[in-house]
Amino acid sequence: MGCLGDSKTEDQRNEEKAQREANKKIEKQLQKDKQVYRATHRLLLLGAGESGKSTIVKQMRILHVNGFNGEGGEEDPQAARSNSDGEKATKVQDIKNNLKEAIETIVAAMSNLVPPVELANPENQFRVDYILSVMNVPNFDFPPEFYEHAKALWEDEGVRACYERSNEYQLIDCAQYFLDKIDVIKQADYVPSDQDLLRCRVLTSGIFETKFQVDKVNFHMFDVGGQRDERRKWIQCFNDVTAIIFVVASSSYNMVIREDNQTNRLQEALNLFKSIWNNRWLRTISVILFLNKQDLLAEKVLAGKSKIEDYFPEFARYTTPEDATPEPGEDPRVTRAKYFIRDEFLRISTASGDGRHYCYPHFTCAVDTENIRRVFNDCRDIIQRMHLRQYELL
């Protein structure tokens, strides 16, 4: 009878043994993958359009990868430099397109504004005609006359006056930066600097992941762009992220969104923040609030042409909090403005705060590498605590 229990052939026994060993290897790899997954800090980057999310990602690459070198992580410095130069070369076209879009948008707006803006030098009209004639030319090759006309128009006081009213139409933030660099960009051997690449605006849509390591800690940053209408469908997919970094264009208080040309951009950001803060899938995930574009906010406030109270009447009654810590040499008007915007967001987070998640505000300038380095270092302890709490280790 005992023989009946051992009726398997040698081949069958060997096959079962091999299967058990394969299962052990798979289980071991799964455990390893699980440990790596749990040890990785996953950051979800959110914010309204043109708030600076993609620029934050670029800064992470400059600071913690190998700059603008494709996938990053090359051990060979020469290969890293080669890849970096290659990517920079491919970005030249994007930068030239930004330059072209900037001058086209400004001169097209001159006749559409109310009241319209006239050229300071009427003899420049033929230059305006040229710029408008090439507006929709596909695969534009940027001949020398383009740069000549663009530079002459940018030096026209009427064009500058129209630029000063750019909150009345849709103009990319980097317009002045690249228009001021026409003589550099037009050179045949032009290679963009890191600052040029940080300023370059390319519309993002979809979800992009950037991986980097800081002091042997792995970070995965997910940049979500162009998803205004689809947000409610995919947001639940990120309910296990370590933290949300919410980016706000603080300078957008006097601008409207591209989608409808009516909704105030800062109000749109407040509405989006509220929807994320109260989202049932994210109720345990804390938010690091990047109050971005502080440089542009300061310029607007000090220029005095667009007053915050004209768009947010409650600002007229706002006083700077006693615990405010201005930057060295910062004008009190700028301090009051930036803390008002901060408190508008904190009002949302404290109104529905249940102790399960918190909001940590920071003032940022995404094109300033040292500012982002300092802010991200300040955030790392917060992120680490969130990570420990996420896996009930704290």
From Swiss-Prot:
Region (G5 motif): 364-369
Compartment annotation: Cell membrane
Residue numbers binding Mg(2+): 54, 204
Extent of Basic and acidic residues compositional bias: 7-25
Covalent lipid sites (N-palmitoyl glycine): 2
Pfam families: G-alpha
Gene3D superfamilies registered for this protein in UniProt: GI Alpha 1, domain 2-like (1.10.400.10), P-loop containing nucleotide triphosphate hydrolases (3.40.50.300)
Gene Ontology biological process: adenylate cyclase-activating adrenergic receptor signaling pathway; adenylate cyclase-activating dopamine receptor signaling pathway; adenylate cyclase-activating G protein-coupled receptor signaling pathway; sensory perception of chemical stimulus
Membrane topology: Lipid-anchor
Residue ranges annotated for the G-alpha domain, each copy included: 39-394
UniProt-annotated binding residues for GTP: 47-55, 197-204, 223-227, 292-295, 366
Assigned GO CC terms: cytoplasm; heterotrimeric G-protein complex
Region feature G2 motif, mapped onto this chain: 196-204
Key words of the record: Cell membrane, GTP-binding, Lipoprotein, Magnesium, Membrane, Metal-binding, Nucleotide-binding, Palmitate, Transducer
Lipidation (S-palmitoyl cysteine): 3
Protein function: Guanine nucleotide-binding proteins (G proteins) function as transducers in numerous signaling pathways controlled by G protein-coupled receptors (GPCRs). Signaling involves the activation of adenylyl cyclases, resulting in increased levels of the signaling molecule cAMP. GNAS functions downstream of several GPCRs, including beta-adrenergic receptors. Stimulates the Ras signaling pathway via RAPGEF2.
Family: Belongs to the G-alpha family. G(s) subfamily.
Identification of the protein by name: Guanine nucleotide-binding protein G(s) subunit alpha
Taxonomy of the source species: Eukaryota, Metazoa, Chordata, Craniata, Vertebrata
Gene: GNAS
